[in-house]
Design a protein with these regions (language model features):
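Short hydrophobic/aromatic beta-strand or adjacent loop that forms the aromatic wall/cage
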Residues: 46, 135-139
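Short coil/turn segments at alpha/beta junctions that flank glycine-rich nucleotide-binding fingerprints
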Residues: 73, 89, 105-109
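Conserved GNAT acetyl-CoA-binding A-motif
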Residues: 96, 103-115
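Terminal substrate-recognition subdomain of acyl/acetyltransferases
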Residues: 138-146
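Acetyl-CoA-dependent GNAT
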Residues: 3, 7-11, 17-73, 78, ...
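Conserved acetyl-CoA-binding loop-helix of GNAT-fold acetyltransferases
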Residues: 88-101, 128
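A short, internal acetyl-CoA/4′-phosphopantetheine-binding micro-motif in the GNAT/acyltransferase core
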Residues: 80-87
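Conserved active-site alpha-helix within GNAT-family acetyltransferase domains
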Residues: 93, 105, 117-136
Length: 146
């Protein structure tokens, strides 16, 4: 199977929106996805790569610089998804390798990824690529009415 990993373009928004909805269960409008993608593509602190197969985007990884006052600079994987029809073909691994490449290019000390506790297939991939288990945390969120 031939696929290519390339930098994301604005015209990839619909495919990313579909992956977010179908593979990760996020209900976020296409218009909002286009708006945020348009901003992130020009933000040097963020990078988005897509996996393309026969002209169709079948996966993506969104990474961002992660800097703290108490640890060295890392790259944080903000989102990674591969179409269920294309999973277990090496695409997720290739996307992670691309993220690691960018991390090294910008002088980051490593890559950080948080993953839902039910995503055992993803956990197996991360472990197979040398990612160690971090500490268990709870994720709190407070949304504001706009």
């Amino acid at each position: 199977m031939e696929y290519v990993i390339r930098e994301c373009r604005l015209e990839d928004a619909a495919a990313i929106h579909k992956l977010n909805s179908e593979e990760m269960g996020y209900d976020y409008s296409l218009n909002e996805t286009v708006g945020i993608l348009n901003r992130l593509l020009f933000d040097a602190q963020h990078k988005i790569y897509v996996a393309e197969f026969s002209g169709r985007v079948v996966g993506y990884v969104h990474i961002a610089v992660y800097e703290l006052l108490y640890a060295p600079k890392l790259i944080n994987i903000m989102g990674i998804a591969v179409s269920s029809s294309f999973q277990r073909m090496g695409i997720g691994k290739a996307l992670l390798e691309q993220a690691e490449l960018w991390a090294k290019e910008i002088g980051a000390s490593g890559v950080r990824v948080c993953s839902g506790s039910n995503r055992s297939q993803a956990h197996a991939l991360y472990r197979s690529m040398g990612y160690g288990d971090g500490r268990t945390q709870l994720n709190f969120k407070k949304m504001f009415e706009l």
